[in-house]
């Protein structure tokens, strides 16, 4: 019972940290660019052009710092997902391997958000300034962000979020049920090996669909787009499995309604 008393709080702490980081990530990627307004040192008249920005050391230093933060997150997220590192962490942390990975990812993302340096004086790729675009573009972006985040949360529920967060591994271990992934079908394991980030399109929508796309936001969107693109490798078998699982879940959801109709 003693190990369980240590394992469960550790897994729950990792989950709480990841949940809080997710809430902060929503603020960082959506609320701040959509509702935060123009920074005090920014504005159309204070911004440099692209050529002038390349000669401004403060802008280049901020972008270089942001790039280092993003690379830190990418290296951590990718390195800890390799088989060698997973084997090492499993040897020393056992069933908490996934929880450790989630906690380290959350901490790396917290570093990115906390120490991110905006470039309000930098050039913009696009900006909705003139009416009616200044009114309708932010509203459209807000709607798309809300829909995207709702889809992201829905997909995480479908994709066994308890296993993704490391909670299910500890729960199964305490009950003596073994490893959760060992109970999944080969088709499901194949899909999970190809798609551990099941929110690619929705996250890209959040990153790119903003009223003003400045240089620091462009850097954030570009690097995450490249990373998400390289991290996915779905093929026709995976798509057929996803389609069959979706149809199965829809049938399960429709059964109570059919019973009530009778």
UniProtKB/Swiss-Prot annotation:
InterPro entries: Nurim-like (IPR033580). The chain crosses the membrane at residues 5-28, 59-80, 98-114, 134-164, 192-210, 217-234. Belongs to the nurim family. Residues 1-4, 81-97, 165-191, 235-262 are nuclear. Keywords: Membrane, Nucleus, Transmembrane, Transmembrane helix. It comes from Rattus norvegicus. Residues 29-58, 115-133, 211-216 are perinuclear space. It is a multi-pass membrane protein. It is found in: Nucleus inner membrane. The gene is Nrm. GO terms for cellular component: nuclear envelope; nuclear inner membrane; nuclear membrane. Its main location: nucleus. This is Nurim.
């Amino acid at each position: 019972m003693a190990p369980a008393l240590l394992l469960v709080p550790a897994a729950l702490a990792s989950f709480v940290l990841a949940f809080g980081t997710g809430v902060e990530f929503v603020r960082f990627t959506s609320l701040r660019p959509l509702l935060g307004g123009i920074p005090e040192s920014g504005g159309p008249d204070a911004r440099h052009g692209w050529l002038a920005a390349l000669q401004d050391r403060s802008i280049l230093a901020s972008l270089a710092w942001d790039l280092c933060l993003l690379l830190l997150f990418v290296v951590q997220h990718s390195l800890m997902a390799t088989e060698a590192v997973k084997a090492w962490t499993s040897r020393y942390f056992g069933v908490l391997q996934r929880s450790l990975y989630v906690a380290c990812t959350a901490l790396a993302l917290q570093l990115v958000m906390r120490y991110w340096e905006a470039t309000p004086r930098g050039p913009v790729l696009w900006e909705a300034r003139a009416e009616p675009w200044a009114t309708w573009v932010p509203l459209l972006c807000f709607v798309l962000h809300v829909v995207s985040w709702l889809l992201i949360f829905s997909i995480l529920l479908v994709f066994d979020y308890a296993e993704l967060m490391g909670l299910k591994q500890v729960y199964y271990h305490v009950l003596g049920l073994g490893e959760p992934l060992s109970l999944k079908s080969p088709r499901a394991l194949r899909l999970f090996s190809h798609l551990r980030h099941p929110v690619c399109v929705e996250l890209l929508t959040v990153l790119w669909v903003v009223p003003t796309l400045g240089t620091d936001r462009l850097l954030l969107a570009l690097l995450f787009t490249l990373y998400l693109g390289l991290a996915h490798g779905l093929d026709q078998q995976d798509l057929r499995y996803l389609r069959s699982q979706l149809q199965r879940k829809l049938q399960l959801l429709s059964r109570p309604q059919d019973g009530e109709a009778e």
